Structure formats: structure tokens, C-alpha cells
Amino acid sequence: MTTYLSPPDVVAQSYGELRRRTIDMLRDIPADMVEAQVPHCPSWTVRETVCHLIGVPEDVLAGNMEGVTTETWTQAQVHRHKSDSLEELLNIWESIGDTIDLLIPQFPEPINSQFVFDANAHEQDIRYAIGSRGARDALSVTVSANWVRNFLAGHSHPQAKEILQAEVSDFDLFRSLGGRRTLAQVRACGLNDNVVNEIVAGMPVSIPTQEISE
């Protein structure tokens, strides 16, 4: 089967770039945005979403992978950092950056790309919450879209190939299959909304009812 995945070194590079630009962006946000609600995340604020963003690499480094991707696993990340300020969280993320960057090239495929896909999803979620549009053409978006293509190539849905072959931007493909587009938005970008809805129903995400522009 053809693989659509980005090369491991590109995946690792994309995560390092994502981490650095997200840290830089968040160091400058107004104090009243720290506890702003992040749309279509599990009732998380900006700060709590960052808890998850650093919690995933923390758990990887600690070998704490039991229940990986489940709500229990992700909520534990938020809980253990519940008393940390945003500045403290960003410092932690920065401090483990070099270590996780060296480890990512050793992640098996496609897990390495899925790791970037998740982080990229939440970077864009935060951007939407704080009104900081950007990084739509970032390397991490290419990596994320390629992970989606690889996922679709191996999917059992009889019309998954239709989504795979659709002419759509990397950003819209990544956000649509990441559960960050309403069905109307999915249709508007040229994808079959019924097929996307059925595929997303089998993923740990869901189709939003209110439009998300990032």
C-alpha cells in the first residue's frame, strides 16, 4: 500500500517548529485570555489545553502510555498541572523540548505523524480561541494532512478513497477529518460531508455544530 506519510525527519522538524511558535505566541497573550474557552475541546481553557500539549510528551518520556488517547489519559494531564500558571507550563514545555525532539525520529510510523496531528489540532484550537490566525501553511499542517491521507488510504469505508483524492487544501483536509469543521464547512471546501461524518464517527473526535474558522 502506498504511504502518504511525511519522512520521520520532517515529522520531527515540524513538531519542533510547532512547539516553538506556539510557546512564542502564548507568551504574549493578555492575561484575560489564559482562561478563555477553547471551542470543541472537552471544556478546556487555553491553559488547560496547554496542559494537554505538554502532558503528551511528558507521558511519552515517562513511558506512561496506558490508556493513551482516552479521556482518562488526557484529563490526568490537565489535572496534574491544574495549579501551574501558563508561564510555568510554557517553561516546562520548553525544558523538555530538546529531549522529545531527539526521541520523535524513533517513534514508529504512523504514530509519529499522529503525535504531530494532535499537537497541531490543539495549536489551531488555541489560535481560534485567542483570535490569532496563522500557521495554516506550516510544515506541521503538511505532516498532519499526510497522516490523514495515510489514514484514509487504509480505511474500510467504501468512499474513503473519494476523500483521499479530493482537491482540497492540506489545512481543510486536516481540520475536516480532525473534527473541527461543521458539515456545512466540510461541504463548502469540496468534501463529501456524509462520508466525512461517517468516518469521523469512528474517531475520538466529533463534528462540531458551530463553525470553527481555524
Task: State where each predicted segment sits.
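Active-site-adjacent scaffolding segments
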Residues: 1-121
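Structured surface interface patches that mediate subunit assembly and partner/cofactor docking
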Residues: 2-11, 33-38, 42, 65-68, ...
